[in-house]
């Protein structure tokens, strides 16, 4: 698979290292924010892997679609405009897969959290909140992964109807609000926790990234899935990829 990598920060470097060491993939372009982009930059690629920044992704969206290549998007922080992006992709008959986090471990974590929220739903005594920690260089807060965790909870727990990303200066958080808090500290790769509490006990579900390798490997595997059979058209999430993998008989 020939990969055009857009974004050469820490995550881009991790993806490049995985691709180069795989023995079966080739990096045909490594582009950063200083690069003047044109569709020619992607002409030799089978797939574009995009890991820049929210503003850069949205600015480059039309050009990426004009390149007529499947696009894997690891950038987060743009999900408020997700319906706009989806409409653009479908209008262009394009191919895009996005994820808040490509790590297999994190995606297992998402499903564990969803089930935990479903289990506590009948019991009014339980409350739930989300916290995350990342390095001080991370741009968006809360992280896209934390917000994905929050959406998993909301989809399974009717008592929570909205996400609150900061506490009010005065007053208290409402029972139907799900608090998602963020800490920026040193060089922490990423830690996400779900806190469940009742008058009798507490439950903590947590995922800690040891490095960026899991994310990078997952992004490559998602790209392989997206380009198979000449390329799949549509707007996909990591759930689409994983659901097909898990339902495939040869994977069981």
From Swiss-Prot:
NAD(+) binds at residues 30, 74-76, 99-102. GO terms for molecular function: 4-hydroxy-tetrahydrodipicolinate reductase; NAD binding; NADP binding; oxidoreductase activity, acting on CH or CH2 groups, NAD or NADP as acceptor. Keywords: Amino-acid biosynthesis, Cytoplasm, Diaminopimelate biosynthesis, Lysine biosynthesis, NAD, NADP, Oxidoreductase. The keyword Cytoplasm applies. Pfam families: DapB_C, DapB_N. It comes from the Bacteria. One of its GO terms (cellular component) is cytosol. (S)-2,3,4,5-tetrahydrodipicolinate binds at residues 135, 144-145. Pathway: Amino-acid biosynthesis; L-lysine biosynthesis via DAP pathway; (S)-tetrahydrodipicolinate from L-aspartate: step 4/4. The active site is at residues 134, 138. Coiled coil: none annotated. Its main location: cytoplasm. It catalyses: (S)-2,3,4,5-tetrahydrodipicolinate + NAD(+) + H2O = (2S,4S)-4-hydroxy-2,3,4,5-tetrahydrodipicolinate + NADH + H(+); (S)-2,3,4,5-tetrahydrodipicolinate + NADP(+) + H2O = (2S,4S)-4-hydroxy-2,3,4,5-tetrahydrodipicolinate + NADPH + H(+). It is found in: Cytoplasm. InterPro entries: DapB_C, DapB_N, DHDPR_bac, NAD(P)-bd_dom_sf. It is an enzyme of class 1 (oxidoreductase). One of its GO terms (biological process) is diaminopimelate biosynthetic process. Its EC number is 1.17.1.8. HAMAP family: DapB (MF_00102). Belongs to the DapB family. Catalyzes the conversion of 4-hydroxy-tetrahydrodipicolinate (HTPA) to tetrahydrodipicolinate. NCBIfam families: dapB. This is 4-hydroxy-tetrahydrodipicolinate reductase. The gene is dapB.
